[in-house]
């Protein structure tokens, strides 16, 4: 059965309580990939995929998910500052729908507003060269997106209590 593409908290209801999640920062040329630990406390960068075709990109993402025994995907949704969705958000939703056809994992969408800008500031603060930043920014943005989503899910669990 194809997966569902849902807002983060709704997607989480479809995931088991434990198991890694794969976070994605979709760009036009690359996809930053991060994976959580099985307890969903910490996001770690995995790689930056140079985009080729959807089929090739999806195959690599599904391979990573399999290698890491992941239970779901979280995609950063680039919402505009006014809350509207522009072409990049529509492209992300289309990618998520296409990926959902290839997996049973629920796919969660997480507001990634300002994630790349925040990561860029952090890397500049580390005195990283522009060339080095360009190589790692997408993977670091995926970490930022996934960690934000993990923190939100942890808060949700604490405030809603057991069951």
From Swiss-Prot:
Keywords from the named record: Cytoplasm, Hydrolase, Nuclease, Ribosome biogenesis
Keyword flag ATP-binding: no
Record family assignment: Belongs to the YqgF nuclease family.
Enzyme class: hydrolase
Protein name in the entry: Putative pre-16S rRNA nuclease
Record GO biological process: rRNA 5'-end processing
GO cellular component, as recorded: cytosol
GO MF term set: nuclease activity
EC identifiers of the protein: 3.1.-.-
Species, as recorded: Nitrobacter winogradskyi (strain ATCC 25391 / DSM 10237 / CIP 104748 / NCIMB 11846 / Nb-255)
Cellular localization per UniProt: Cytoplasm
Gene3D superfamilies reported in the protein's UniProt record: YqgF/RNase H-like domain (3.30.420.140)
Protein purpose: Could be a nuclease involved in processing of the 5'-end of pre-16S rRNA.
Database matches in InterPro entries: RNaseH-like_sf, YqgF, YqgF/RNaseH-like_dom, YqgF/RNaseH-like_dom_sf
